[in-house]
């Protein structure tokens, strides 16, 4: 997806359509001073069934899945958007050690196919800050 956003500089459009493994997606680019500042995409309906995510959990939807990394406990909500995601709330994303915890949590036994780990900070009712540890890739700007 990131490569498509970079192409904007050549085509000067605010909407870009791309084909992904999860289907065709439309990206809406927020442009400021001729640079892509943010990208918005409708990823469709999330998959919430544990066996389809996949995640090992008796609870559906999977909320408050408690996992531990380096003696720190996390509570995750898990979804699939074509691949497994586990989201947890942290106090401050800027100071949070994403690499330290992401690489451990990605391969937790609760995730048979590994998982993308999102560390989210709630700013207000409409905004969050998030950092992403992508399975097999490390921290990304996704």
Please provide the spans of the model-predicted regions:
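Active-site proximal loop and beta-alpha junction motif in alpha/beta enzyme cores
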Residues: 1-141
């Amino acid at each position: 997806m990131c490569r498509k956003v970079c192409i904007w500089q050549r085509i000067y459009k605010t909407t870009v359509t791309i084909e992904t493994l999860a289907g065709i997606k439309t990206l809406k680019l927020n442009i400021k001073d001729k640079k892509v500042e943010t990208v918005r995409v409708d990823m469709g309906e999330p998959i919430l069934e544990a066996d389809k995510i996949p995640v090992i959990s008796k609870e559906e939807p999977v909320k408050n899945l408690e996992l531990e990394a380096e003696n720190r406990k996390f509570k995750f909500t898990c979804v699939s958007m074509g691949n497994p995601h586990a989201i947890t709330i942290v106090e401050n994303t800027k100071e949070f050690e994403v690499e330290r915890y992401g690489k451990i949590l990605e391969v937790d036994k609760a995730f048979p196919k590994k998982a993308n780990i999102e560390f989210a900070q709630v700013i207000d009712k409409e905004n969050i800050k998030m950092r992403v540890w992508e399975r097999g890739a490390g921290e990304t700007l996704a």
